[in-house]
């Protein structure tokens, strides 16, 4: 699992990287990190994601995001698993 650096957080905030919440839409709607977009792991549709940008993925505890990281990497995306929601909220300064 990767821990975001301050520069990586800035890249997300300024739109140079994606923060992708791979939980279900209901889970996402119950609370998510700022700047996150929701692409549920169950229907991983990446058509609107620019392959030239880094993708940081998270879920509830890191399990689904680990699987998504692997899948995206196999498809040529630059993806990193950053763990669970509370890890992300802490790193983003939202905890």
Regions from the PLM with identified roles:
Residues 2-8, 12-18, 25-54, 63-95:
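Rhodanese-like catalytic fold shared by cysteine-dependent sulfurtransferases
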């Amino acid at each position: 699992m990767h821990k975001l650096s301050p520069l990586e957080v800035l890249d997300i905030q300024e739109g140079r990287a994606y923060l992708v919440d791979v939980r279900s839409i209901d889970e996402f709607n119950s609370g998510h990190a700022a700047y996150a977009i929701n692409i549920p792991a169950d229907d991983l549709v990446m058509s609107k994601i620019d392959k030239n940008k880094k993708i940081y993925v998270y879920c509830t505890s890191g399990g689904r995001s680990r699987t998504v990281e692997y899948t995206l990497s196999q498809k040529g995306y630059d993806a990193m698993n950053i763990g669970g929601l509370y890890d992300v909220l802490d790193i983003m300064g939202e905890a």
